[in-house]
Amino acid sequence: MARIKGKDTKPELIVRQYLYSRGYRYRKNVRTLPGTPDIVLKKYRVAIFIHGCFWHGHEPHLRLPKSNREYWEQKIARNRERDEENKERLRRLGWSVMTVWECQLRPECRRDTLLEIEYHLNHNYLNQFRQPRPYNDTETGTPQVAESNTQYQKTTE
């Protein structure tokens, strides 16, 4: 397991290259945030985790090794728990969290996944400015719209 890369994996590079080509600027592997998200877009308040299907237990694609099965079940269960804890901590800090699975970046569905990431970023950014503001009526009395004394004269032609 010491040879397993934790940074700059192929799925991460695919997402980062797409975001950069579309004009998004980001930080990678930000250690100051819970869970050290793979990609952080501070302007959009979005943290993106890119998970491998095996290591993080993505159900449709999870195949445990036949040897030492109990160890792998516990390890992957703990990874899932830790992922959920980190996501919840980020949400409490005001971050929107996205999880992109390795299988979502396969060539047949990559385009849809990348467009979905971009949609989420834009939607999240716009929602920062759409916060409802309470109406405050600070004026007392009814405001006057028309002139106070207007004399209308009949015009003759």
Go through the PLM ranges and name each one.
Residues 1-99, 103-157:
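Nucleic-acid endo/exonuclease domains
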